[in-house]
Amino acid sequence: MIDADGFRANVGIILANTQGQVLWAKRVGHDSWQFPQGGIDEGETPLDAMYRELWEEVGLYPRHVQLLAATDNWLRYRLPKRYIRHGQHPLCIGQKQKWFLLKLDEPNTEHIRFDTAKPEFDHWEWVSYWYPLGQVVHFKRGVYRRALRELARELPLKKELILPETKNHLLQV
């Protein structure tokens, strides 16, 4: 679904373990890594889309995870001009995303799989919470930063989480 401003409605998933690490996945056929994400279908709520994408991209059911939080508002990013398909109608100039923070208990890591009908990822690893900011493609960095900062307070941690840019303590648990 593309809105009147040209932004495609989408969900992003930050899947965290109990150590505060997040699932970081490599796209099939590319040397690029990202969080699971995907479009919202017609008539679907962002929450429904998130659970569908969780299954389609990572092989997890709602029973495998605990929903901790979601961003309050849509977070937007514009696509670089070279990625805009000018012959497409309606024209998509970027994405607007609702982000969800989920907790995966360690016993459920065995359920993570990519052998789905249309695999989008072929490898995954647990990385530190802020690691994706320096690794994701440049045009998504602002959205990743806003989503990670907004959702960080909901992480169930046994240690401090420090903002990468400032070295300030974000929270102490």
Swiss-Prot record:
Enzyme nomenclature, EC number: 3.6.1.-
Keyword Hydrolase: yes
Keyword vocabulary terms for this entry: Hydrolase
This protein's record includes keyword Calcium: no
Task of the protein: Accelerates the degradation of transcripts by removing pyrophosphate from the 5'-end of triphosphorylated RNA, leading to a more labile monophosphorylated state that can stimulate subsequent ribonuclease cleavage.
Disulfide bonds: none
Motif (Nudix box): 38-59
Known cofactor(s): a divalent metal cation
Superkingdom of the source species: Bacteria
UniProt cross-references to CDD domains, sorted A to Z: NUDIX_Ap4A_hydrolase_plant_like
Gene: rppH
GO-annotated molecular function: pyrophosphatase activity
Pfam families named in the record: NUDIX
Family named by the database record: Belongs to the Nudix hydrolase family. RppH subfamily.
Name the UniProt record assigns to this protein: RNA pyrophosphohydrolase
Gene3D superfamilies: Nucleoside Triphosphate Pyrophosphohydrolase (3.90.79.10)
Nudix hydrolase domain residues: 6-149
Cross-referenced NCBIfam families: PRK00714.1-1, PRK00714.1-4, PRK00714.1-5
